């Protein structure tokens, strides 16, 4: 089996994402990855992550795999919880206030900080539009975050999300 076939198998089993670590474990060398990238067979989306050229990649999954601290929140969580129909231009993530993210991740998303002991509160897994499961906050935590950070959120997003949540039959008021 040649390198591209191995990478197709990896891609199929990992929601379209090929990580260098996984490719190396399967016998594909870094030189092969570089050559396939130059030949246009695969595309590098970030350090250590590739996709097959003909496929779209899941940005949220890519971000999540680059840091285990990331939990999608605010506008991104509104979208994942189906409170908002609008895809956010920039993904919003929350991390513990005692931690930092790499510059490459920080440049791609809006970062919110929270006390370490509150970081895991309301954490759940939901599917992205591409079907990958990512960590995000549940509806109730998301609404609390939106209210807490309303000065950093567009007025239209704030008001529509509160109205949408209030009219939702899935809210948990207990």
PLM regions with names:
Residues 2-6, 28-31:
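N-terminal amphipathic/basic helix or basic patch
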């Amino acid at each position: 089996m040649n390198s591209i076939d191995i990478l197709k198998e990896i891609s199929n089993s990992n929601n379209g994402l090929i990580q260098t670590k996984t490719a190396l474990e399967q016998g594909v060398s870094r030189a092969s990855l570089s050559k396939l990238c130059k030949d246009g067979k695969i595309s590098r989306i970030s350090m250590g992550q590739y996709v097959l050229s003909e496929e779209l990649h899941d940005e949220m999954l890519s971000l999540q795999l680059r840091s285990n601290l990331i939990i999608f929140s605010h506008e991104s969580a509104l979208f994942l919880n189906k409170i908002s129909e609008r895809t956010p231009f920039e993904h919003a993530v929350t991390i513990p206030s005692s931690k930092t993210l790499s510059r490459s991740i920080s440049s791609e998303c809006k970062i919110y900080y929270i006390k370490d002991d509150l970081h895991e509160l309301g954490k759940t897994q939901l599917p992205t539009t591409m079907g990958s499961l990512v960590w995000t906050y549940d509806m109730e935590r998301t609404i609390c975050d939106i209210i807490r950070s309303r000065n950093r959120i567009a007025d239209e997003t704030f008001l529509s999300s509160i109205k949408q949540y209030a009219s939702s039959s899935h809210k948990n008021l207990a």
